Amino acid sequence: VAVAVIDPVAIENKLSTQEFPEILKSTPSIYATKQGGGFGDSRVNVRGFESENVAVMVNGVPMNEMESGKIYWSNWAGLSDVTRSMQVQRGLGAAKVAAPSVGGSINIVTNTTDVKAGGGISYAVGNDGFNKIAFNVSTGLRNGWAISILGAKSWGNGYVQGTEFEAYSYFGNVSKQINDKHMISLTVLGAPQWHNQRNDNLLISEWQKHANKYKFNAVYGFGLNGQRKVAGYNKFHKPQISLNHYWTINEKSSLSTALYVSIGRGGGYRGQGNSTYKNSWYATALDGTLNTQFRAADGTFDYAAIYDLNMKSENGSQMAMSNNINNHEWYGLLSTYTTQLGQYFNVYGGLDLRYYKGTHKAVLVDLYGGDYYVDSESRKNVKAENNALAQDANWKNEKLKVGDVVYRNYDGFVTQEGVFGQVEFNRNALATFIAGSVSNTMYWRYDRFYYDKAHAKSGKADFWSGTVKGGANYNLDEHNNVFANIGFISKAPFFEYAVFLNKENSNELNKDAVNEKIFSVELGYGFRSPVFTANLNLYRTAWMDKSMGASVTFQDSDERGRINMTGVDALHQGVELEVMVKPVRNLELTGMLSLADWRCNSRATGYLYNDQGIPLTKDGVVTTEKSKEHAKVDVDLKDVKVGNSAQTTFAFGANYQVLKGLRLGADYTHWARNYAKFKLQGSDLSKELGKTMKYDTPWKIPSAGSMDVNMSYRFPLGKVWGIISANVNNVLDQE
């Protein structure tokens, strides 16, 4: 298995003020970035696959949000302080859960009974007002009990305009070794935070027009009387509580069970506007240029002009701000049984159960000087056959105040039940395994905005999925080994992208939704010695029936449409090399090279439906399904490069212990062949209905590299130890 393990020393020495995933940026085929630059807004891609296709776990418990598969790292800001190890498997991997991952898995293992007694306090200061204070204390294992506690606070201004943040993190673990057969462990962790964001997607030429360049935030500006305003804002708290039981049944068998719950509360801002101003909150036009409609002379967003517009209006606020609330409740059970059969076989089997409810609504938080807001743009799309209020003119033109609901109010439900198993054979130089899983995922909605109580609950969609994979490793001698893995994955589509015609406003199921299929093959070679280590991996992953779609609007009709594409396929293949050399005592040199070819390789087809699942012509008129008049579009994606992740990366680093306690380090990472992420746009598809649309490879981002340097000094302070560390990230000032 292609695997990397990050230990606490590496995290302490190299992470500094970076986002937690950025500790992985020198790992082959991993692309970690800050995205817009707001606190916790980072993401990590593995072998070209985005976070929804990378399984992220804490102590083996899955963390990916169940409606979209996404990971929001701001929810886990404090994990770096209590991480015992961060295990990253690229490719098929060996994660013991029923739901499969495509790109790989990241498992963060936290402290438990093996933590030594002691504790510490720390303070960190960095650029742009960054501050962090933290403490931790552990009792070690005493009389069968072990307790670990951590608390931290981070705050700062952010290096991007107007991206202030304040974050707390906490971790608590109480473990009890009942006897030599049973141990229980209760873990509580969370990271409440708020932060301002930057979410625009400007062309490089647009960034370069501004004096602040890459610190520029297009939604940062000033309101009446000069008060600072930022349209991008996020606040969230997602505590997780897990109760683990470890049972050593006998010398050959054990049972590990985790019962967990996660309750998320929070959301983020989204601008609202009437028909004239509904797109005015977007800082970037579709062509990547700056939206200048509400732009002050100095380039900042002109909130004062919005106040002026609303206060002069006789019809309430023309533009307003809502908070998109995304609360959830998640309950799960994960249990794994392990036993040894005979001398050479190990068998694993388990159960993975999950229940998830997400509550999604939007409430007004700022009228920007107006007396009220009329949500006519959304309410005009409510159909009388779904909600009797659609015939009530007073409801359609209701004067809404702060706290009232706009544009959406629904619950998303996901349940998953699965089993998994694995058999391993180990004898002499040969180790083999075969593994499989089967799971059923069910989705449904309950809508309170577009549907009345009689029609609020949607039908249920369930998808059976599974995996079959196997592999072998052979040690040629004490230094050399080779391995191979092969696997097939059938994966349920996500609630957010494909199951419903429109996840925000429609209970109609997408008739064309099917499982995504993945076939993957890996080959590897490894060499180990006291002074030199090398790993070489080759992989090829075919991704079939990828979920993709877009919404469509019509100029001469209030009807809204949705096109869900079928037959979207992609191929991810590449080679990875990593080496480590210890040429002299106290000096360690590392290097990495990753060369990839990730591209789409199919022609996809999509038909046009409205939010009620009724087929439409290209003019938005109701027609017969799959008839000649039923509007469709063919999209030729052949050889379009997969974007959002560098397809060529290399890195090298050095770590030298100058003298006892003093260590210096430097790491350089280079990214090339990184293409912009392409996305099907409804405005483009609507122009090509009835035709074949050819997508070209998106813009290739210029190659770039970044060097980070670090230093740490560990010294005695009486009976305790002190550590001073310093980091300079991007020391070469690469833009």
Language model features with spans:
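Extracytoplasmic beta-strand/coil segments of soluble accessory domains associated
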Residues: 21-62, 78, 84
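Short acidic/polar hinge/loop motifs at secondary-structure boundaries
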Residues: 62-90, 109
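Transmembrane beta-barrel wall of Gram-negative outer-membrane proteins
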Residues: 125-155, 160-198, 240-250, 471
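Acidic/polar loop-and-plug regions of large Gram-negative outer-membrane beta-barrel proteins
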Residues: 175, 183-246, 269-322, 386-400, ...
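Conserved C-terminal beta-signal and adjacent last beta-strands/turns
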Residues: 189, 227, 484, 519, ...
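Surface-exposed extracellular loop regions of Gram-negative outer-membrane beta-barrel proteins
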Residues: 200-202, 442-449, 460, 474-520, ...
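Signature of Gram-negative outer-membrane beta-barrel scaffolds
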Residues: 346-480, 502, 605
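Gram-negative outer-membrane beta-barrel transporters
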Residues: 426, 540-542, 563-680
